[in-house]
């Protein structure tokens, strides 16, 4: 059910860091309520890319996405960028009105840059604000290093795992860093 207080969490895996050269190869979304309770998990989509795009990945992306199995899932996928965008929008429209949720995640500005370039309808669905967990991570590193160090991430670099970790990390900072 649509609620303007719900939060949209998104994570993208890309072939690199430059939205003008690189492309999205996986995306996932989760909708939470304002207390960070998961309401629904959206589609987890490996986006097909031609072999020449995959061959152009740098060493880190080639190793990481190869080891995680994502590269093979991308090869086997039949879902285009436009289809992935449409599936994700159809899911979000069930839970959150357009332009009511900030885009939520870790280092979310990078994901937003790729959405702006490759999935503009999806990027336009979000409010212009960002809820970026990495802001709290950076503040904790400077003001309360023990709080930052006490949260350990799995670093699988798979979209759904990364979102779940971002939500858990924000809960951690809410419980141990932010005085409510």
Swiss-Prot record:
Q: Which family does it belong to?
A: Belongs to the oligoribonuclease family.
Q: Which organism is it from?
A: Pseudomonas aeruginosa (strain ATCC 15692 / DSM 22644 / CIP 104116 / JCM 14847 / LMG 12228 / 1C / PRS 101 / PAO1)
User: Where is the protein situated, by its record's location annotation?
Assistant: Cytoplasm
Q: Which cysteines are joined by disulfide bonds?
A: none
User: What EC designation does it have?
Assistant: 3.1.15.-
Task: Give GO BP annotations, semicolon-separated.
Answer: DNA metabolic process
GO MF term (any one):
3'-5'-RNA exonuclease activity
Q: What is this protein called?
A: Oligoribonuclease
Under InterPro entries, the record lists: Exonuclease_RNaseT/DNA_pol3 (IPR013520), Oligoribonuclease (IPR022894), RNaseH-like_sf (IPR012337), RNaseH_sf (IPR036397)
Known function:
3'-to-5' exoribonuclease specific for small oligoribonucleotides.
UniProt keyword list: Cytoplasm, Exonuclease, Hydrolase, Nuclease
List, for all copies, the residue spans of the domain called Exonuclease.
7-170
């Amino acid at each position: 059910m649509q609620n303007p207080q719900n939060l949209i969490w998104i994570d993208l895996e890309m072939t690199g860091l430059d939205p003008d050269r690189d492309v999205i190869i996986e995306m996932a979304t989760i909708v939470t309520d304002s207390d960070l309770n998961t309401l629904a998990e959206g589609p987890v989509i490996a986006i097909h890319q031609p072999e020449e795009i995959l061959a152009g990945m740098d060493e880190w992306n080639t190793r990481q996405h190869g080891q995680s199995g994502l590269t093979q899932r991308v090869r086997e996928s039949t879902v285009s960028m436009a289809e992935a965008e449409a599936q994700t929008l159809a899911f979000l429209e069930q839970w959150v009105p357009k332009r009511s949720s900030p885009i939520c995640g870790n280092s979310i500005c990078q994901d937003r840059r790729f959405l702006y370039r490759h999935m503009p309808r999806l990027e336009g669905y979000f409010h212009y604000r960002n809820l970026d967990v990495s802001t709290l991570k950076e503040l904790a590193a400077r003001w309360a290093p023990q709080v930052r160090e006490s949260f350990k991430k799995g670093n699988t670099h798979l979209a759904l795992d990364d979102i779940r970790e971002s939500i858990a990390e924000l809960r951690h900072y809410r419980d141990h860093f932010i005085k409510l």
